[in-house]
Amino acid sequence: MSIDNQASTALKNSGQEVKNNTNQTSELSKEEKLRKRREQLELWRQKKQQQQQEQEEVQNKAKKTEDSTNNTSTEEVKKSRQQRIEEWKRARLQKQQATKEKTTTITIKKKVHSQTTRPTLKRNLDFGDDEDDRKNSHRPVFKKPSLEYDEISEHQNDKESEDELDVFLASIRESELKSDNTKAEKAIESIPEGDVENEKENDDYGGDGDEEDESDEESRLQDLISTKLTKLQNKGKELQSIDHSQENYQEFRKVFYREAYELSALSDEQVELIRQDLDNIKVKGTDVPRPILKWSHLALPTNLSSVIHDKLKFEKPSAIQSQALPTILSGRDVIGIAKTGSGKTLSYVLPMLRHIQDQQFSKDNQGPIGLILSPTRELALQIEKEILNFTKRNNNLRVCCCYGGSSIENQINELKKGVEIIVGTPGRVIDLLAANSGRVLNLKRCTFVVLDEADRMFDLGFEPQVNKILTQIRPDRQTVLFSATFPRKMETLAKQILTDPVVIIVGGISVVAPEIKQEVVLFETSAEEQDKYKQQRVEKLHDILTNYQIEHPDSKILVFTEKQNDADELVANLLSNKYPAIAIHGGKDQMDRKYAIKEFASMDSGINILIATSIAARGLDVRNLGLVINFDPPNHMEDYVHRVGRTGRAGAKGNAITFVSSSQPKEVFNLVKALKLSHSDIDPKLEEIANKFVTKVKAGKEKISSGFGGKGLDNLQEVRDNKLKLEKQRFGDQQPQRQQEETETKKSNDEPVPDIALPEFNIIEGNTPETSGPDKCKFYCRIVINDLPQKVRWNIVQRESLSKIIDESRTSITTRGQYYPPGSKPLSNDQERNGSLAKLYLLVEGLTLQSVTEAITLIKKKMLESLDILNQRENLQPTGRYVV
């Protein structure tokens, strides 16, 4: 056992010694390897550092060489490249348009619809290697620059001689030419030989094709503008034409009056005396009924007569009512002229109600029996209020007031339920007639038509709308016209829509009622002292208001101004001086105007002063209105009659005070004339100023104007002539002249509209007379935009639109001249010398013919865009389906 143990122990010891020796050997080999690796890494680092130093030296040499050989800076190179890119784009675009038009011409001859337009290539202008290789494989491949000095120099020399951008553009042109030639060859192969010969002949004798294409494009734009302008002129609220001969109208009764025995027993001399006593009534016409003396002579139904006696408490008819009521109830058409506040409204309301009661009441959406048209919203509301006195107790008599500025949905709701009477303004009535293709409102049942304030309605230019409405009504209707004034030139127009009318004139035309006490306050100021004149009037107004309100604390006061701004300023002044006041004028919303009248008319509102423009001169009937003050004198006598006629109504007494300056001779002349006609006292100073004015008129230095001239009436014939001239130009004057018999029997349904002149785009070579200074143009063009529609003008002259056109065309565009309303003419026709007096126009100036032509093309496109928008709005407004 001991021997074995010793042997095993010896073996173990020897094994450990061997193991220790091998471990020492492996440790030595690892250290050597690590040392060798470190030495190799150090050598590699030294070599790498040496290579980097050499590379930096080479790069520095290359930079020095580049600086010495390349004199153009990097920014200049980029700028020149960008310019060449823009020129290439422009040339390519022109070439595409020319190619497109030529190819279209060829395909038209073949009568085969083929797509000839090329897809646009989206090209990245960043000339990176990846993008170039991926999108344009046919580009020339440039040699990659190395680190050698000689190679870099050679590459820079090549770059100077032939730029990479030029090579790129040239390669694209070559590819496009090849593709265009291929397409052209294919198209020509498909065309018959005869057509090809014709094309060759056209090329030989036709001149430059590009110029022809440009002229064709210009003529196309010109034709489009002309077409859209003509369409806009003829655009209106189209109503369905009605052939009355084909309609099966029911017969209706017109005559409801039987003359009383005591009236029929009177002799003609006695009748004339009665008319003289009734404010000197004058009648024109055949078989005119005699005037009534009391309400019982009319034999009205109880529901009407009870309202007159019990509610309105009218003891006897007024002068106009005495003659107009029996005439209208006899079925005659009437023209009634009487002073304001004389009861004209009741003169046609009573016959209309009697007329309606004799017929079957309207069912749902059958249309009204009576139609009353008024020029203003306020007058329409006043008429509705008068009718409601009779209809509140009778549920079968329904009335609807239709006017602009308020929601049309509520009006459509009322019409769908069925109404017997419509009171409205012409514009809104046409809207309702045209709405939903005529299914909202029709006038086939209408047999009684009233035009209140007819002269003002025609004078405001409502004649086309009124004629259009009357074409929708049966020809055997009964038509009545009433007004306080009736100029002689209106008589002919009124008789065109009436049949054998009876003219009734009470108290003379344009005469102030004798119940009104008139006073004129004269201020001795010159035309230059406007501020002083205004301050004097304000102080005088304060004195009058203070004294009058002390004597009449419950009386209402109406103050008229000429301008809307003056009305607002005067209200602010009165409120600051503790005078409760409110204003009404055309610049306010309909809700504000309605609220102002309601507050002013109310006895409990505490507001007794209303400041208004002439918008309140018609139809405003406020009880206890005792004083009218003309802060600004009216510019004609008819307006004065209507203004002061707001007081002294229904037999009550009234006062009217007018402020006027000695520097306003025309206004003084009108006031003196009105005072003479009403037999009032006249200040000698006023007569002196008026006589001087008459002397100047006789010498031709001044001119007398009357009525609302210049707002439509005087231009009606001129508008018709312009429209006829436009039709002759459009149709080459080849239409035969209309026969006189046809014009007498058939009334026109078209609405005369102002003639919209087509702008001219003539380019003139030379300097413009309007331009002064060293910078002058070589080409210019005047584009008259005065006669274009307002929204089209605004879209063209907007700063953004003009700036865009100026930037794209590199021209100068300025707005010159001044705006002239339709029908008016410039003071001088010489635009060359009087550019500031000419009609509103755009002056386009440029250094080249091409730039001016490009600017004109852009302006034409802007015109077309604006006309399209305007036509779309016109289409949506009148004929859209209203959703209730």
Curated annotation (Swiss-Prot):
Residues 28-45, 58-67, 75-90, 173-188, 739-750 have a biased composition (Basic and acidic residues). The keyword Hydrolase applies. GO terms for cellular component: nucleus. A motif (DEAD box) lies at residues 452-455. Residues 325-504 form the Helicase ATP-binding domain. Keywords: ATP-binding, Helicase, Hydrolase, mRNA processing, mRNA splicing, Nucleotide-binding, Nucleus. Residues 192-217 have a biased composition (Acidic residues). Its EC number is 3.6.4.13. Residues 1-220, 727-754 are annotated as: Disordered. Residues 1-25 have a biased composition (Polar residues). InterPro entries: DEAD/DEAH_box_helicase_dom, Helicase_ATP-bd, Helicase_C-like, P-loop_NTPase, PRP5/DDX46/KHDC4_KH, RNA-helicase_DEAD-box_CS, RNA_helicase_DEAD_Q_motif. Its main location: nucleus. A motif (Q motif) lies at residues 293-322. It comes from the Eukaryota. GO terms for molecular function: ATP binding; ATP hydrolysis activity; nucleic acid binding; RNA helicase activity. The Q motif is unique to and characteristic of the DEAD box family of RNA helicases and controls ATP binding and hydrolysis. Belongs to the DEAD box helicase family. DDX46/PRP5 subfamily. ATP-dependent RNA helicase involved spliceosome assembly and in nuclear splicing. Catalyzes an ATP-dependent conformational change of U2 snRNP. Bridges U1 and U2 snRNPs and enables stable U2 snRNP association with intron RNA. This is Pre-mRNA-processing ATP-dependent RNA helicase PRP5. The lineage of its organism: Eukaryota, Fungi, Dikarya, Ascomycota, Saccharomycotina. The gene is PRP5.
